[in-house]
Amino acid sequence: MAGLYSLGVSVFSDQGGRKYMEDVTQIVVEPEPTAEEKPSPRRSLSQPLPPRPSPAALPGGEVSGKGPAVAAREARDPLPDAGASPAPSRCCRRRSSVAFFAVCDGHGGREAAQFAREHLWGFIKKQKGFTSSEPAKVCAAIRKGFLACHLAMWKKLAEWPKTMTGLPSTSGTTASVVIIRGMKMYVAHVGDSGVVLGIQDDPKDDFVRAVEVTQDHKPELPKERERIEGLGGSVMNKSGVNRVVWKRPRLTHNGPVRRSTVIDQIPFLAVARALGDLWSYDFFSGEFVVSPEPDTSVHTLDPQKHKYIILGSDGLWNMIPPQDAISMCQDQEEKKYLMGEHGQSCAKMLVNRALGRWRQRMLRADNTSAIVICISPEVDNQGNFTNEDELYLNLTDSPSYNSQETCVMTPSPCSTPPVKSLEEDPWPRVNSKDHIPALVRSNAFSENFLEVSAEIARENVQGVVIPSKDPEPLEENCAKALTLRIHDSLNNSLPIGLVPTNSTNTVMDQKNLKMSTPGQMKAQEIERTPPTNFKRTLEESNSGPLMKKHRRNGLSRSSGAQPASLPTTSQRKNSVKLTMRRRLRGQKKIGNPLLHQHRKTVCVC
């Protein structure tokens, strides 16, 4: 059937709840090469082809209702001049375009999926027989293009990042491809990214039936299991999922692989066919256990029957059945054309519905991608319903489009927060105009406390010890005296502990400081300084509540009740040493205290 039709294409991808985004999509529309464009040996070099005028020199410049991306590229094919005589055959024949759609779901890294996105279409159209009118030759060329892309990945394996264990990259990807040329649709796929076709059997009935064009390449299929086991591979069930086993030497093995080498069998991949996955190469058979050869099929499009073509990754088909997906797209199109609602595109709607079902089941959403192609007979007022998220194509007008030039990643509402791009300022606080306080080594005290201590140290000590009858200055002098004592301890490099005190204790400390003589102050300094032969064991410092620590500044606090003297200080020092010996009696000596682990303490309140 040589009917005219137009395509409304929408594409959308979402990272879901996964840490990495490994789904990629590709849309390429370009003029189909014809036999007249190829240089003929009979043509003389003195008769070059007429130059193609630039788009700026074209008359008019008006765009059609097929979207800005298509209209800008349609201008590349000039219209024949009204005053000039038409060419014999080239101007009378309108060139058509070929459309290429692909969804690739990567695993083990994004490298294989990205490589397939950039080179798969180029390998397919270079194969001999792809431009043939015979479907069998076209399908053979598509299969050769898949294999050529797979072998090209082998050459790039050294450039791909290695695994965490230092092994070569295990990156691979599924690939579902739809090629539309004229009234023929060619489908090729490897993996579990499916293609669904919506068919309306009765024009009087609004029901559109979903037909699965592809079958997922799962290891549990009898055909795939037989092929895998015939190549020396195996399939193993892990957590309810059948996976292709990766037979690799043990990581501790060095040198060539022999019969005595221990081989680990790891259930690895949940698909039986994919591009990449170079770890599955079998040296005995010379083939890949995870096959890169696709399944191909040919379909003749009828705009009156075929309404939708949906390409999706497993993140979409695991949540939305094919029939539900077709019905959702049909409802979305009815809202757009009948009710005039310009909402989200069909692809975005399907992806959002799938993510919602992932959340309803309380599961971490997988990478989800979808390409929806709406087929309709050629309509004159197609431009009235143009949506910025959709691309409208008429392949007979020879349009050109490449999604790599306009690829924009959309953040997912349920994905891990992405890493900031390099264009943003990596050091916002450093480059900001706000004042940032300098780093000060406060020695376990706040900055304000050190300023107060330094200010008091510069003052005269006599102003601190003079008693006052007024209660408010008395409290201020007491606080300064306590701060001065702490500052003195800091100069002696001794750790101290602050305890809450009331006004009575503060007054007693003020009196003690006033009554102290130079000899008594020297005795207090001797008490604060630990003796040279005193060794603090690790058990004492880390024992926690098992033993009570000695209060070092207790003498100055109790000096009001009993005058301090040098003999009393020596007696107390001897008693402290005796108490420490009794507490450490029976404990095991430690060779190196730094290697000793901390004790676990339990506080019972």
UniProtKB/Swiss-Prot annotation:
EC number(s) reported in the record: 3.1.3.16
Biased composition (Polar residues): 530-544, 555-577
CDD domains reported in the protein's UniProt record: PP2Cc
Summary of subunit composition and partner proteins: Interacts with CHEK1 and CHEK2; dephosphorylates them. Interacts with MAPK14.
Disease: Jansen-de Vries syndrome: An autosomal dominant neurodevelopmental disorder characterized by mild to severe intellectual disability, psychomotor developmental delay, speech delay, and behavioral manifestations including attention deficit-hyperactivity disorder, autism and anxiety disorders. Most patients have variable additional features, including feeding and gastrointestinal difficulties, high pain threshold, hypersensitivity to sound, hypotonia, broad-based gait, and dysmorphic features, including mild facial abnormalities, strabismus, and small hands and feet. Breast cancer: A common malignancy originating from breast epithelial tissue. Breast neoplasms can be distinguished by their histologic pattern. Invasive ductal carcinoma is by far the most common type. Breast cancer is etiologically and genetically heterogeneous. Important genetic factors have been indicated by familial occurrence and bilateral involvement. Mutations at more than one locus can be involved in different families or even in the same case.
Amino acid composition bias (Basic residues), ranges on this chain: 579-588
Cofactor(s) needed for function: Mg(2+); Mn(2+)
UniProt main location, coarse: nucleus
Residue intervals of the PPM-type phosphatase domain: 8-375
Enzyme class at the top of the EC tree: hydrolase
Official protein name in the record: Protein phosphatase 1D
Region listing for Interaction with CHEK1, in residue ranges: 1-101
Cofactor-binding details, from the entry: Binds 2 magnesium or manganese ions per subunit.
Induction per the UniProt record: By p53/TP53.
Effect of D314A: Abrogates phosphatase activity
Listed InterPro entries: PP2C (IPR015655), PP2C_BS (IPR000222), PPM-type-like_dom_sf (IPR036457), PPM-type_phosphatase-like_dom (IPR001932)
Modified residues (Phosphoserine): S40, S85
UniProt catalytic activity: O-phospho-L-seryl-[protein] + H2O = L-seryl-[protein] + phosphate; O-phospho-L-threonyl-[protein] + H2O = L-threonyl-[protein] + phosphate
GO biological process per UniProt: cellular response to starvation; DNA damage response, signal transduction by p53 class mediator; DNA methylation-dependent constitutive heterochromatin formation; G2/M transition of mitotic cell cycle; negative regulation of cell population proliferation; negative regulation of gene expression, epigenetic; peptidyl-threonine dephosphorylation; protein dephosphorylation
Residues given in the record as Mn(2+) 2 binding sites: D105, D314, D366
Family stated for the protein in its record: Belongs to the PP2C family.
Keywords: Autism spectrum disorder, Cell cycle, Cytoplasm, Disease variant, Hydrolase, Intellectual disability, Magnesium, Manganese, Metal-binding, Nucleus, Phosphoprotein, Protein phosphatase
This protein's GO CC annotations: cytosol; nucleolus; nucleoplasm; nucleus
Presence of keyword Flavoprotein: no
